[in-house]
């Protein structure tokens, strides 16, 4: 059964969504992310993906107080990303209640440090964030596209011990046009034992079913819930 991971993206302490990572498209869905997290938990959800978009842009963890509130007032298993640049940032995230953290930009800009995190904290706590625009890795809140190819980038870190990756096709993020199933299949075929968490484009229950049928173990979704394209009660069949 595919693992369901709703996303809460945070700017100025509020639950927001962007379209294709563009901060100018910010739309506030709820003033209180804790309220959203409790709603998910009340509908059988066990995992949560929390992104500090302020942190991603500033290069330092900012919204850890929100993380702490969600972690102490729900039982959700939280992975946290955005602005993780130093080991101190990870310590703050873990102390604030995250069970896992996601590193994206840091894995490109400072591979030695990211690799040291895998060694120190273990692959069960460190998730690779591999966000791609036309199969090229994008970083810094998706505002910069690199020349690194997606699949070799992931494979390199798999060889260094990474077991989980969140892969976002930026072109589909927030567009509600369906996930990049062929891309995830390509990664799965190249790295069969990798735990792939699909992200971006989910617009319906049918999209989740297609990912499940394709053998993708987990999916992150956000806008489809916030825009009412997916009803929380419809997710119960997967939980």
From Swiss-Prot:
It comes from the Bacteria. It is an enzyme of class 5 (isomerase). The keyword Mitochondrion does not apply. One of its GO terms (molecular function) is 1-(5-phosphoribosyl)-5-[(5-phosphoribosylamino)methylideneamino]imidazole-4-carboxamide isomerase activity. It holds the Pfam family His_biosynth. One of its GO terms (biological process) is L-tryptophan biosynthetic process. Pathway: Amino-acid biosynthesis; L-histidine biosynthesis; L-histidine from 5-phospho-alpha-D-ribose 1-diphosphate: step 4/9. It is found in: Cytoplasm. Keywords: Amino-acid biosynthesis, Cytoplasm, Histidine biosynthesis, Isomerase. It catalyses: 1-(5-phospho-beta-D-ribosyl)-5-[(5-phospho-beta-D-ribosylamino)methylideneamino]imidazole-4-carboxamide = 5-[(5-phospho-1-deoxy-D-ribulos-1-ylimino)methylamino]-1-(5-phospho-beta-D-ribosyl)imidazole-4-carboxamide. The active site is at residues 9, 131. Its EC number is 5.3.1.16. Gene3D superfamilies: Aldolase class I. One of its GO terms (cellular component) is cytoplasm. Its main location: cytoplasm. NCBIfam families: 1-(5-phosphoribosyl)-5-[(5-phosphoribosylamino)methylideneamino]imidazole-4-carboxamide isomerase (TIGR00007). Belongs to the HisA/HisF family. This is 1-(5-phosphoribosyl)-5-[(5-phosphoribosylamino)methylideneamino] imidazole-4-carboxamide isomerase. It comes from Parabacteroides distasonis (strain ATCC 8503 / DSM 20701 / CIP 104284 / JCM 5825 / NCTC 11152). The lineage of its organism: Bacteria, Pseudomonadati, Bacteroidota, Bacteroidia, Bacteroidales. The gene is hisA.
């Amino acid at each position: 059964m595919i693992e369901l991971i709703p996303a809460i993206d945070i700017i100025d302490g509020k639950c927001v969504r962007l379209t294709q990572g563009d901060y100018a498209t910010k739309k506030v869905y709820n003033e209180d992310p804790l309220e959203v997290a409790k709603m998910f938990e009340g509908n059988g959800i066990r995992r949560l993906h929390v992104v500090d978009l302020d942190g991603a842009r500033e290069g330092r963890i900012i919204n850890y107080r929100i993380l702490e509130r969600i972690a102490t007032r729900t039982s959700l298993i939280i992975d946290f990303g955005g602005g993780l640049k130093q080991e101190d940032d990870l310590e703050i995230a873990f102390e604030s209640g995250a069970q896992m953290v996601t590193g994206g930009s840091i894995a490109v800009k400072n591979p030695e440090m990211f690799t040291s995190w895998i060694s120190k904290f273990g692959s069960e706590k460190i998730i690779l964030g591999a966000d791609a625009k036309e199969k090229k890795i994008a970083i810094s809140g998706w505002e910069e596209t690199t020349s690194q190819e997606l699949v070799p980038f992931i494979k390199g870190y798999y060889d260094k011990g990474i077991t989980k990756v969140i892969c976002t096709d930026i072109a589909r993020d927030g567009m509600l046009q369906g996930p990049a199933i062929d891309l995830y299949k390509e990664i799965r075929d190249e790295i069969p034992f990798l735990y792939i968490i699909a992200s971006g484009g989910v617009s319906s229950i049918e999209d989740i079913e297609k990912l499940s049928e394709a053998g993708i173990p987990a999916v992150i979704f956000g806008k489809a819930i916030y825009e009412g394209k997916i009803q929380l009660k419809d997710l119960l069949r997967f939980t």
